């Protein structure tokens, strides 16, 4: 698969970003220094339903879905200033994004471009460097759930393909340099980034 250097056309998100607050959240105990990228277990709608179900005991700050149209969908489930339950002992230290399953298979890159823009936005607002950290216990940056190892629950998402991950990180840096996604992202406590 040949990965594009940039989106074929600008990524446009709905205005405003969709919000559906998950009960699966709690107070943060520290300032986040990581962005952790995940791959949901299922498709967009059912994944949102599951992450908003108290029985799941899991959540994320944002979940994205690509539709291959250039207009992609993102829903925020947990306010930025709260802890999402997504990666075990790293929950307080991180912002967590679930990126549509098809993005990591190369079937629909829209969700990956949207997630890159979100990561660029978070990096701009928080000072987290737009760089892949493979030492998430000690270095700030962006990491895969997989990179957290056993301390993050022992997962292999969103991808173990280093070539694809490096491509994704180039998109994050590109969005960071453009200023990230800013004005239309949320109101009230959803807009505040801890």
Question: Positions of the model-derived regions?
Answer:
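N-terminal catalytic cores of peptidoglycan-degrading enzymes
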Residues: 1-91, 152-161, 189-193
């Amino acid at each position: 698969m040949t990965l594009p250097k940039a989106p074929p056309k600008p990524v446009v998100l709905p205005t405003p970003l969709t919000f559906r607050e998950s009960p699966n959240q709690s107070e943060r105990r520290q300032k986040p220094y990581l962005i952790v990228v995940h791959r949901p277990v299922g498709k967009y709608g059912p994944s949102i339903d599951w992450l908003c179900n108290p029985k799941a005991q899991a959540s994320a700050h944002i979940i994205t879905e690509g539709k291959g149209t250039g207009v992609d969908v993102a829903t925020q489930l947990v306010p930025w200033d709260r802890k999402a339950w997504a990666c075990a002992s790293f929950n307080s230290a991180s912002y967590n994004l679930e990126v549509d399953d098809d993005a990591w298979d190369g079937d629909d890159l829209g969700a990956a471009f949207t997630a890159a823009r979100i990561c660029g936005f978070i990096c701009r607002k928080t000072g987290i460097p737009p760089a892949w950290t493979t030492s998430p216990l000690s270095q700030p940056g962006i990491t895969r759930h997989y990179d957290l190892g056993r301390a993050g629950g022992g997962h292999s998402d969103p991808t173990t393909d280093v070539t694809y991950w490096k491509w994704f990180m180039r998109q994050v840096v590109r969005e960071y340099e453009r200023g990230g996604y800013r004005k239309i992202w949320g109101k009230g406590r959803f807009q505040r980034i801890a």
